[in-house]
């Protein structure tokens, strides 16, 4: 009996190593759903919202190298969009199968018709529609190959009637090829980099996620150069651990130590980073960048020279040419300052807060201390990113996932679904904001349906905390950032999972410890301080002025209590400003 296209697709996906598809089934996807069920190797994960499926696929792809989600014609396509933007901007390989209305109805404004080429073009590296049995397998292989090779999203539109059509023999390959090329600067370029670094008395290294696989080489380079090492949020888990030269992160979520090291150096070496915040980059230094995507060179900093290369391969060639710097005064100065910064962070943890105003720093540090050495963390965009960036420590085995480039809310819980399904033996903890969790709350039902032992920690500050801070820094009294939330603990129980509410700071440690010990999903709803602020590495006069203006306007509007609470909650930042 001949196969139909849906069955042919499943065969190719199995050969590519696909274990699951995240989707909401629908009429144009039904033949694919049925083929998956009958073949038996791939699990159909019934999410409640396609956006959650795309986020989950993005998480699995970042951890394992390739994942698949799907959406049916019309609304199913539109619901995928935000999650696919996240995957594409995060440079992770995801295949999105977008089943469409029947091909005979194309261009007629048919029920649930969407133009997938137009719709997905800005969030994909490959975007095509298969119209014939001959095209279908070739396009599927091409879509998978593009996703892997270009590290992005491939979208393949497939008319619902094509899935049930008789398949034709594929005239090209059914296999997907995961390559690992060696990319290094030329000999002349390596020599130039070595000469520059050897001539520098004060060198600072800044690493992104592209340097994560080169931990040993980065540390060896820093040892020779006596160079402090800073890193991006995404690069933290791959660089921070077992690293006597690290000085933390810079950027909006970072610490003044990395900012200081980069600005006091005479040479800055950027490794595998596409760090987007130009204001935190020095401008009067020799700046050298190495990246495996040469199109990124120079778009974030005023480079002296840029080079194409994988970081590990490049440093292996570079290290023998680097001379040992016997003077470590610059390094010692930066490490001493970093120790003061870390001591300051500890002081925030010691202040646990009060009833219904629990210190979020204390909560994050408690999670860090109680979590396993190989935990996979997911963090919501917003204040959860701040607390995760500053308090979740790398071990060499931990992973940290978030929306670091796209910056979407509501990502942490869906990403935890993908992380837990693909790594059932690992502890997965989602640090969720109340705003983010509220957006896609319904997929707690997915966690329950598959009995995923995810631990959801809600930083419930009853506000859009980051937006509130952004408004106040710009001199605007916050407006419509407050949230009237449901009882998340009770809601969790209504979904059929464990739910715990915590309002007393003295009960935080026990609640988190108990939650992590439960063999099953748990939601811990912690009432954190809505007025807790996060100070960036460098606080300018305009920011202080803006905050002062906002507080004054709020007092004139009669919001004296909120102003008083903000001051009381953030007295600990005074020494940073001064």
Go through each PLM region and give its residues.
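Active-site nucleophile and cofactor-binding loops and adjacent substrate-binding regions
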Residues: 24-26, 45-55, 69-76, 131-132, ...
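N-terminal alpha/beta PP-like core and its mobile active-site loop of ThDP/TPP-dependent enzymes
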Residues: 1-326, 366, 370-373, 453-456, ...
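Active-site diphosphate/adenylate-binding microenvironment
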Residues: 6-14, 24-27, 32-39, 339-414, ...
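Thiamine diphosphate
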Residues: 97, 105-112, 298-300, 306-308, ...
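Conserved structured core elements
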Residues: 3, 215, 259, 309-312, ...
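Phosphate/pyrophosphate-binding active-site segments
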Residues: 1-4, 134, 157, 169-170, ...
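Active-site-proximal structural scaffolding
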Residues: 222, 262, 360, 440, ...
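Generic detector of well-ordered alpha-helical packing
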Residues: 51, 162, 292, 379-381, ...
